[in-house]
Amino acid sequence: MAGKKAPYGEFAGRKLKLKRKKFRWSDIRYKRRVLRLKEKSDPLEGAPQARGIVLEKIAVEAKQPNSAMRKAVRVQLIKNGKVVTAFTPGDGAINHIDEHDEVIIEGIGGPKGGSMGDIPGIRYKVVKVNRVSLKELVKGRKEKPRR
């Protein structure tokens, strides 16, 4: 006859606690959180936003069944020198961004911190250009400061 798996009894609390602690390591989400793997691999280093310099403007092809060229920029982050691609949301938003502009980027809001919708491999979006909101620039409410 097979024995019982869990320790039962009045004083089994410590043993149960230790057992639970041991088996938590097989949970991937727990492991990634405790070992801080996201912050270590994330270009933004766990921060909600980051500042960077625009290196070039690019167009990325949308995934099937859509057909479009999604406008994006390659940005070099100031804090660690890493280069990431950031989407420029809004109609004609790319026209308000030039090379060597200072931009603020943030996550695009896809599942599990990944890319969103039909834009493949792009995890970030541009929020501000030269300290002015990109949304305001696109709507024509504000003008980009001349340097």
Curated annotation (Swiss-Prot):
Q: What is this protein called?
A: Small ribosomal subunit protein uS12
**Gene Ontology MF term list:** rRNA binding; structural constituent of ribosome
UniProt function note: With S4 and S5 plays an important role in translational accuracy. Located at the interface of the 30S and 50S subunits.
What HAMAP family does the record tag this protein with? Ribosomal_uS12_A
Q: Which family does it belong to?
A: Belongs to the universal ribosomal protein uS12 family.
Please name the taxonomic classification of the source: Archaea, Methanobacteriati, Methanobacteriota, Thermococci, Thermococcales
Domain of life, per the record? Archaea
Q: Which gene encodes it?
A: rps12
Q: Which InterPro entries match?
A: NA-bd_OB-fold, Ribosomal_uS12, Ribosomal_uS12_arc, Ribosomal_uS12_bac, Ribosomal_uS12_euk/arc
Q: Give yes or no: UniProt keyword Ribosomal protein.
A: yes
Provide one Gene Ontology cellular component: cytosolic small ribosomal subunit
Its quaternary organisation is:
Part of the 30S ribosomal subunit.
* Species this protein is from: Thermococcus kodakarensis (strain ATCC BAA-918 / JCM 12380 / KOD1)
Q: Which GO terms describe its biological process?
A: translation
Q: Which UniProt keywords apply?
A: Ribonucleoprotein, Ribosomal protein, RNA-binding, rRNA-binding
Cross-referenced Gene3D superfamilies, in alphabetical order?
Answer: Nucleic acid-binding proteins (2.40.50.140)
What the entry lists under CDD domains is as follows: Ribosomal_S23 (cd03367)
